[in-house]
């Protein structure tokens, strides 16, 4: 997966390549099922009262793959138009206007280590502050 042109910032949590790399791997696997229509459904929620979504499903149901797919589609950090053009969402011209247009915060909670809850939260907050400061140095945090 390559970085998008013009993107100088790529952080640990903000605009990381992780969702794009992980989704591209999944999309190239033998048993891949195209569920990109979900992206169009999520895009319809932007700016509405239903913009906050909680997806609760049993283990091994594909929640992480869906999160990676959405992050890969929206993130400014990776050029993924070629990948998604081959999938169902590629036929949705309205949805494709959103591809690679957004800053994405991607947190893999299983990769953040800590000894207690407060330091766990502090580690996430510190990493996010660093990324935001790199991306927006003129803003006070």
Predicted regions and their residues:
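Phosphate-binding site recognition
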Residues: 2-141
